[in-house]
Amino acid sequence: MESAATAVVPPAAAATTATATDDNLQSSDSSSPADAVNRLIHAFSQRQQHLLDKTVPHVLYRWIACLCVVLIYIVRVYFVEGFYIITYAIGIYLLNLIIAFLSPQEDPEASLTSGGSLPTRRSDEYRPFVRRLPEFKFWLSIIRAFIIGFMMTFFEVFDVPVFWPILLFYWVMLFFLTMRKQIQHMIKYRYVPFSFGKKQYGKKPAPTESSE
């Protein structure tokens, strides 16, 4: 009488397989919530970036929205009569943004010391002004600064008692000195951070009628 052959699995191997299976199940269960959160954050970031990209050509509307955000923050600080240290910090941050917005991407001093040269005569080649901080990033940084500052005004821990006229006077003096230095830098290296008034290339002058 023939007996059916059965494979016998050692107990140690069976225990190892069961333990590995349990570990895989536990690791998959523990990583699932984290993966879901990461996917949610990634989807939100993509959606936010898509909306921001759509606003790039609408310069006027973007700055109108920025002005509205600034006014909302000012009204909030005016009615609560506090959080002046946050306003001062935003002012210092805005001053740094303005300097970066008005500065060229390549420092002229570094170009001269490294052996480069800038066009100093009218006959030299025209070089367009490239900002260190582009206009869109400048706008976005201002929006984010005031939104974060507005949210911080709902927490009393940030309401540090301070005599606000001193902060205002110090900021005005810092703004004056910084802008004077920036203007001197513009005059020294002969660049203008704005496009209006610059020579337009590629356009032919209108023909003039000759009198016979």
Swiss-Prot record:
Annotated function: Involved in the retrieval of endoplasmic reticulum membrane proteins from the early Golgi compartment.
Name this protein carries in UniProt: Protein RER1C
Family: Belongs to the RER1 family.
Entry-linked InterPro entries: Rer1
GO biological process: one example: retrograde vesicle-mediated transport, Golgi to endoplasmic reticulum
UniProt entry keywords in alphabetical sequence: Acetylation, Membrane, Transmembrane, Transmembrane helix
PTM annotation (N-acetylmethionine): residues: 1
Bridged cysteine pairs (disulfide): none
Originating species: Arabidopsis thaliana
Main location: membrane
